[in-house]
Regions:
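Single conserved hydrophobic/aromatic residue that forms the stacking wall/gate
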Residues: 1-7, 11
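Transmembrane helix-loop junctions in multi-pass membrane proteins
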Residues: 14-23, 52-55, 111-117, 141-149, ...
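C-terminal ends of transmembrane helices
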Residues: 14-23, 73-84, 139-150, 201-209, ...
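Entry/N-cap segments of selected transmembrane alpha helices
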Residues: 20-50, 60, 98, 125-126, ...
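The feature identifies polytopic integral membrane transport proteins across all domains of life
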Residues: 28-35, 55-68, 84-94, 119-124, ...
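Membrane-embedded alpha-helical segments of transport systems
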Residues: 37-42, 68-74, 89-109, 127-131, ...
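Hydrophobic alpha-helical transmembrane segments in multi-pass integral membrane proteins
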Residues: 42-47, 103-112, 166-178, 227-245
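Helix-helix packing/entry segments at the starts of transmembrane helices
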Residues: 153-155, 210-234
Length: 273
């Protein structure tokens, strides 16, 4: 209940607006370190796990895909719960989303190109359609109408959660045969991928001398990915039942682990630098 109410609160207060990008000017070090961690740690971990577990090629590509995606709203919710730097979290999510049309296809071409054919331009176009166009429309809507359609502010988190649940059901049904044969191994890989993302994200920031609040923030930004985007890309590739499996498993798990970590951190006041 605490997590769902926080999600609604963060959505209403942090629905993407032009203000979210001011953090690039106010916190350039945190944004730069966060982006570097975001687009190195998880893609490399994904490639390593896909190779180590020797998954079928399209399943392996799905693991790399979820690792190569930007963070999503869930990381903002967890940062809020964990008393982390919510402003940095929102800015990182916004900037990572905007650079995703270049970074995600580049990482997929580089790391997953040996598993499945990757069309850079087609994937870039897909990401524009799935994320960038809705984000731009959301920015415009938020600028002109935020607070004027309160029923929409309340409805959107519910609609989003219902939509995600429906998509996961479709992927699970479509990938039933693969799930029965490698499901447990894929769940294990998703858990390792996610947990190591938190660990490397947190300690990577520690190495650069970031404060505790910022380290917590970037741990969530790195460990929690935009499963909806990864699923959309898999659908556009026509491989929802294979490439889409890893994002479908990673998404629910990251919310469980993220909530647990956020609750644990919530009771521990961030140490001052």
């Amino acid at each position: 209940h605490k997590t769902s109410s926080a999600a609604s609160d963060v959505y209403k207060r942090q629905a993407m607006s032009f203000k979210d990008f001011y953090g690039v000017i106010k916190m350039p070090k945190g944004v730069l370190i966060g982006l570097v961690c975001q687009f190195t740690i998880m893609p490399i971990l994904g490639f390593s796990l896909a190779s180590l577990f020797n998954f079928p090629l399209e399943i392996a590509a799905g693991i790399i895909l979820i690792g190569s995606s930007p963070s999503g709203l869930a990381s903002n919710v967890m940062a809020y719960l964990a008393k982390a730097n919510i402003a940095l979290s929102v800015t990182l999510t916004a900037v990572a989303t905007l650079v995703a049309p270049i970074m995600t296809p580049f990482l997929m071409k580089t790391l997953a190109g040996s598993f499945v054919p990757i069309d850079f331009l087609a994937m870039m176009t897909s990401i524009f359609k799935i994320v960038i166009v809705p984000v731009l429309l959301g920015l415009i809507f938020n600028y002109f109408f935020h607070g004027k359609a309160k029923w929409l502010d309340k409805a959107m988190p519910i609609i989003s959660m219902a939509g995600i649940g429906f998509i996961i059901m479709i992927i699970t049904a479509a990938g039933r045969d693969d799930l029965l044969s490698i499901g447990l191994l894929l769940i294990l890989a998703a858990i390792i991928h996610n947990l190591l993302g938190y660990v490397f994200g947190y300690w990577g920031c520690r190495i650069f001398g970031m404060c505790e609040q910022d380290c917590r923030t970037i741990a969530f930004e790195v460990g929690m990915q935009n499963g909806g985007l990864a699923t959309g890309i898999a659908l556009e590739m026509g491989k929802i039942s294979t490439v889409g499996l890893a994002p479908a498993i990673f998404g629910p798990w990251m919310n469980i682990s993220g909530s647990s970590l956020a609750t644990w951190w919530r009771d521990k006041e961030p140490k001052k630098k």
